[in-house]
Regions:
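Hydrophobic transmembrane alpha-helices and their immediate loop junctions
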Residues: 1-247
Length: 247
């Protein structure tokens, strides 16, 4: 999700998956725990959450990485702090491949959620959509005898569906923001970058209001405020460099 590749540490976990190098920065584990540590959760629930986040973000980034490799580049995956990164050094740039690469991450998560739903059905448990409770996760399923398994399955669905949808919002540097930037820059090379940053600011600001005022989710609201501020700063830097009306 975020763009800057963190420096290596001696506490990194390194491995390869399908020929793609993967590095897990220690801050990944810390921030994943912090996301639920403030809630009244049992230690086993925290463990289920960490495992679900690790699997889901890894699959998301591998979705990007497989398409990067398909287009002839050499990807590497880094999991760190608040997300992950499929890093590579592009040797050419075209709109459609970049859009496909950006969409491949959320698509991989949706596919994983579909596999989880299929596994629920295969185990003889019912699944339905609660249209009156779309947030944070509209899919409901019959509980398993094991509470831990039920928690893990719920976490997997929430992460891969909810985070996947939010990640497609036109907010840079989310995947949806990268897609909107590619489209707007293609339609208007002179102003596309600036327009995409403005879209990011308004979308992030609107989502912050919705998350806090309508859904009461302070942490999500803070994240969207940070996105709005970051894009505002990028817009100011863009105007300073290339000229344009400041805000």
């Amino acid at each position: 999700m975020f763009l800057a590749e963190p420096p290596r540490t001696r506490y990194d976990v390194n491995f390869r998956l399908a020929g793609i190098p993967v590095r897990v920065h220690p801050l990944f584990w810390l921030m994943t725990v912090i996301l639920v540590a403030t809630q009244d959760t049992k230690p086993v629930d925290v463990l289920m959450w960490v495992v679900a986040v690790f699997i889901s973000i890894l699959v998301h980034e591998l979705g990007h990485a497989f398409l990067i490799r398909y287009y002839g580049w050499r990807p590497r995956v880094i999991l760190y702090s608040l997300g992950g990164l499929a890093a590579y050094e592009p040797t050419w740039h075209r709109m459609l491949p970049q859009i496909i690469i950006s969409f491949a991450g959320p698509a991989a998560g949706f596919l994983l959620a579909g596999i989880v739903v299929a596994a629920i059905l295969a185990s003889g448990h019912g699944v339905h959509i609660d249209w009156e409770a779309l947030f944070p996760m509209p899919i409901r399923f019959d509980r398993y005898a094991s509470r831990n398994l039920t928690v893990f399955v719920y976490d997997m669905l929430e992460i891969n569906i909810l985070w996947g949808v939010l990640n497609l919002l036109p907010i840079y540097p989310l995947d949806g923001g990268k897609i909107s930037q590619e489209v707007l820059n293609h339609l208007n090379p002179a102003e596309g970058i600036k327009q995409s940053l403005m879209v990011s600011i308004f979308t992030a600001g609107g989502m912050a209001v919705v998350m806090f005022a309508k859904l009461g989710d302070l942490y999500a609201a803070i994240f969207f405020v940070l996105f709005a501020v970051m894009n505002y700063q990028m817009l100011q830097q863009y105007n300073d460099r290339f000229g344009g009306r400041g805000w």
